[in-house]
A protein has these predicted regions:
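Short catalytic-loop micro-motif centered on adjacent basic/acidic residues
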Residues: 103-107
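ATP-binding Walker
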Residues: 32
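Conserved substrate/cofactor phosphate-moiety recognition/catalytic segment
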Residues: 36-102, 145-147
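Structural signal for conserved beta-strand scaffold positions within catalytic alpha/beta enzyme cores
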Residues: 49, 135-137, 184-186
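Short amphipathic alpha-helical segments and helix-helix/interface helices
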Residues: 38-39, 89-90, 120, 124, ...
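Conserved GTP-binding G-domain of TRAFAC-class P-loop NTPases and closely related GTPase folds
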Residues: 7-10, 14-15, 20-23, 27, ...
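ATP-dependent NMP and nucleoside kinases share a basic, alpha-helical "lid"
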Residues: 56-61, 65, 110-158
Length: 194
């Protein structure tokens, strides 16, 4: 990254190659900047997103929350969206046609133990240890900032009720991300390479 004030390049502490056999879990609350980080780092072609599958399976649903009309992602298709996420991950990890290689980013909150363990299990089953799992942890962002950003989404299907965010915070606080045996990185210290 170029630093104009100093006229030099700043080296990030960690590099992730888009050609590596790496599965990167984008962990963080809704509105913490996961999708923006992926877009800003030109990683969108390497992303699997359960939210995208939910929108493919069902249009947003109309609802009234706190007396206000709004749209939400249909949570009734969440299970199927995660099944498709797992199927796509298995396909990417097992694809040998044309000597395919490449990183895979999974854009979800990963604020539950099960979601992380499921992905880790799939990676191990499909690659027998040839691929690694990394967590890019966006939980450094203060909850007040997450809620401020979320309020800016009000009226769109990307808005998440604050009670849901609070519940995710509680779930995430129970997790010890260092117990999964994977690298946990601060996204501000990661550089993407080709």
């Amino acid at each position: 990254m170029y630093c104009p004030k100093k006229g030099s390049f700043i080296m990030k502490k960690h590099a992730i190659s888009l050609r590596s056999s790496t599965v990167i879990l984008m962990r963080g609350l809704p509105g913490s900047g996961k999708s923006t980080w992926l877009r800003n780092n030109n990683c969108e072609d390497y992303v699997i997103s359960p939210d995208t599958f939910q929108l493919m399976l069902s249009p947003p649903i109309e609802t009234t929350r706190d007396g206000e009309f709004t749209y939400e992602i249909n949570q009734n298709v969440s299970r199927r969206a995660w099944e498709l996420t797992h199927e796509c991950l298995r396909s990417r990890l097992s694809c040998k046609v044309g000597n395919a290689v490449g990183a895979t980013f999974i854009d979800a909150t990963f604020m539950s133990d099960r979601a992380v363990r499921d992905i880790k299990r799939i990676v191990l089953e499909e690659t027998q240890g040839r691929a690694i799992v990394v967590i890019l942890d966006f939980t450094y962002l203060p909850i007040e900032e997450v809620k401020r950003r979320n309020k800016m989404r009000r009226g769109t299907y990307r808005y998440v009720p604050e009670c849901v965010i609070d519940h995710m915070v509680e779930l995430g606080a129970q997790m010890d991300v260092n117990s999964y045996g994977v690298r946990v990185l601060d996204p501000r210290e990661v550089q993407i390479t080709v």
